């Protein structure tokens, strides 16, 4: 449910009553609102409609000393210039590469991706739009369908919980720690160029800074470094071949917990 200010100049709304009614009849509805409507919203705006998050993404925001869990929603239209349908406008349809880039810079930065698809004047989705969505689904399954970490060498039960593909299990750093590492050993040297990491958020977003490292020539080599992780973080880096890989939690606000740590080899990524 959007509390969108577009076109509202000069109008006065009883937001408290609107939200009270919504919670009465649809209590599980997610309310989207900008930070100006801080007390009403469950999700916040990314800041524009480009389809990407270009900043460190923390789910908790602070207004006047009051903290609230408000994940970011990344809204962008399937067609480049508008949200509503226009005839003879197929040329504005975003390319598959543009959509993949948007996915990886929204979902892959811990956001909720809202891709706007408008019905035509017959109340149906245009065939070209539907075809592009099928292409996108196929491409995502191809890119992220072969998790190389699933074929890891035997490890301890704690580490295995971040490698099992089960979102209901997680690896935990030592209780009360503010730094830790999760190491994966593969059966043989393996080439990869993407990592996908998911943080366990039931007890809050904890990871503040991390690196992903590969063991090469007798030492750890950092492939990528980042700030917060959150629900899902997709990192891309030049292809590397290694048998040992680690997620290194450099700093965390509290005990870090990781739902999933996955590696992928994506051909022609970024081209």
Regions found by a protein language model. Give the residues of each.
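Trp- and acidic/polar-enriched beta-sheet ligand-binding modules for extracellular glycan
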Residues: 175-179, 201-271
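Mature catalytic domains of secreted/periplasmic carbohydrate-active enzymes
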Residues: 2-164, 169-178, 183-191, 196-198, ...
